[in-house]
């Protein structure tokens, strides 16, 4: 947004129609930007249904259109080809430590040590690491060390794998939306530089950081899945939260139920087509 808004001002002054796709997270921080977006753009297209409600509640919704999330289409394609569940008596734990090398350096040691704790307590866990294609294999091997020989590594499409697994440990971000689409109980971990974390605490105005929790919130700010942030993100806590899902079927089922409800915030398949139609409508004068 700090780049796009000045650009949008220049385009608007030049008479170039501006459509914001997607809406910045004004509902989470720096909400004053919403009026600027409304003034500069012909329209704002949102991924999540609650974002449209947020704009409506502030009298800014007349030119906001909820188009839905393109991941829904991707999920429909991937989930159409199911992955086998673990063998009887086995539990599958999936790790998604992020897509950027910086995230991997912060989170993979945490997940490595957490799986070591779990392996020392129980012998029924199969660990699968989803490696983003943007992450060098050498970096993963360097950090994972001997644990790599006990893990299965996958890259590429993985939503069907998530849907056929028991628990996901995941970096906060878009990957939690993938977990929501797969309706898998998850433990969300988040570590950033201390200064970034302190600034975030001052600026961010929502109780949860994981999109999976924000989307599945029934309205009371409660968490569907645990978030372990900064100092709370320790190997012991991660292992503890994973075992709570593995050993409490009712808790896991409730998480899946709430995640399924949260999927409704993403819309039905067809988001790319709806987005294109909305942009064409706005350019034809469907909104100011």
Where are these regions (language model features)?
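Nucleotide-activated sugar donor-binding and catalytic core shared by glycosyltransferases
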Residues: 1-288
């Amino acid at each position: 947004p700090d780049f796009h808004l000045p650009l949008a001002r220049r385009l608007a002054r030049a008479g170039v129609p501006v459509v914001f796709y997607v809406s910045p997270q004004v509902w989470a921080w720096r909400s004053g930007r919403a009026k600027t977006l409304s003034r500069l753009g012909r329209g704002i297209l949102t991924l999540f249904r609650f974002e449209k409600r947020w704009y409506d509640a502030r009298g800014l919704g007349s030119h906001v259109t909820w188009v839905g999330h393109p991941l829904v289409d991707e999920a429909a394609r991937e989930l159409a080809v199911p992955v086998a569940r673990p063998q009887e008596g086995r539990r599958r734990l999936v790790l998604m430590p992020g897509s950027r090398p910086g995230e991997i350096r912060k989170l993979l040691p945490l997940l490595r040590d957490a799986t070591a704790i779990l392996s020392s307590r129980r012998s029924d866990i199969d660990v699968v690491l989803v490696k983003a294609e943007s992450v060098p294999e050498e970096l993963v091997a360097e950090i994972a060390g001997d644990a790599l020989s006990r893990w299965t590594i996958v890259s590429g499409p993985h939503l069907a794998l998530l849907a056929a697994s028991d628990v996901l440990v995941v970096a906060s971000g878009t990957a939690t939306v993938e977990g929501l689409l797969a309706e898998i109980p998850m433990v969300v971990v988040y570590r950033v530089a201390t200064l970034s974390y302190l600034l975030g605490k001052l600026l961010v105005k929502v109780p949860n950081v994981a999109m999976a929790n924000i989307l599945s919130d029934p309205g009371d700010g409660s968490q569907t899945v645990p978030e372990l942030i900064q100092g709370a993100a320790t190997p012991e806590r991660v292992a503890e939260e994973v075992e709570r899902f593995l050993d409490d079927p009712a808790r896991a089922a409730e998480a899946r139920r709430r995640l399924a409800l949260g999927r409704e915030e993403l819309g039905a398949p067809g988001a790319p087509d709806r987005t294109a139609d909305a942009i064409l409508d706005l350019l034809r004068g469907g909104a100011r």
